[in-house]
Design a protein with these regions (language model features):
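N-terminal auxiliary segments of SAM/dcSAM-dependent transferases
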Residues: 1-41
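A short glycine/serine-rich beta->alpha loop
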Residues: 43, 51-60
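Conserved SAM-binding loop and adjacent beta-strand
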Residues: 56-74
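Conserved SAM/SAH cofactor-binding pocket of Class I
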Residues: 70-132
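A short helix->loop->beta-strand "cap" motif at the edges of active sites that frequently abuts
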Residues: 104, 168-171
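Active-site segment flanking the S-adenosylmethionine/decSAM binding pocket
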Residues: 132-167
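Conserved beta-strand signature within the Rossmann-like core of class I S-adenosyl-L-methionine
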Residues: 170-180
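Active-site capping/gating segments
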Residues: 180-218
């Protein structure tokens, strides 16, 4: 199976030897186009490091929080069944795809990065589901039952988004592995679960523990 051409070209511009391949996620039936792990097992040149930092290809990894959220929806489909769902910062689309497979009425993958939206399209096709797509969360109307979010809080400047999620959806389900002092009056932790980014980046153990938070409009 050939990798999506536009995604492969974009990845090769960052890392000349990088290749996309189909990976089955651990503890899941989902398959995604992800970077081949062999490309990560070497030192990067200064130019490669600069390019990665300027345009990080988040979409070619399945981050631990996304994997936790996808597994959670597969195990607890009542969270999305028959609902309109928006996946904020969708990346590879793993959570959006899991929501669609769990019986959501509609799932929108939302990401600022056009390459991420292409990855979502390719991965949706790989898993036999249909998604809709948006590049601007704030252009969407308040019509969603649930906003799902994975690893959007890696930058603490994004914390105000916790309120914005509830401006577009009646509920929010947020998976996060970065914020250790998470406090918000509307969000309650549902679970603390273990997962790793795929391909495995050998992240510190603390980043393999993912908290799942739920909020509902007051």
């Amino acid at each position: 199976m050939n990798a999506p051409a536009q995604l492969q070209r974009a990845l090769a511009e960052l890392l000349g030897d990088a290749r996309l391949g189909v990976a089955t996620l651990p503890g899941s039936e989902l398959r995604l186009w992800l970077i081949d792990a062999a490309n990560m097992d070497r030192a990067f040149s200064p130019d490669e490091t600069r390019r990665i930092l300027e345009e990080p290809p988040y979409w070619c990894f399945c981050w631990a929080s996304g994997l936790v959220l996808a597994r959670w929806l597969a195990e607890h489909p009542h969270w999305v069944r028959g609902k309109r769902v928006l996946d904020f910062g969708a990346g590879s689309g793993v959570a959006a795809i899991a929501a669609a497979r769990a019986g959501a009425l509609e799932v929108m993958a939302c990401d600022l990065d056009p390459l991420a939206l292409l990855a979502c399209q390719a991965n949706a096709a790989l898993n036999g589901v249909e998604l809709s797509y948006s590049a601007d969360f704030f252009q969407e109307t308040d019509r969603f039952d649930l906003i799902i979010v994975a690893d959007a809080l890696y930058d603490r400047a994004n914390l105000p988004l916790l309120d914005q999620f509830l401006s577009r959806g009646r509920e929010a389900l947020v998976a996060d592995s970065r914020v250790r002092d998470f406090r918000h009056p509307l969000y309650q932790r549902l679970a603390l679960l273990d997962a790793c980014t795929w391909p495995d980046l050998a992240e510190p153990a603390e980043f393999r523990q993912v908290s799942l938070y739920h909020a509902q409009r007051s």
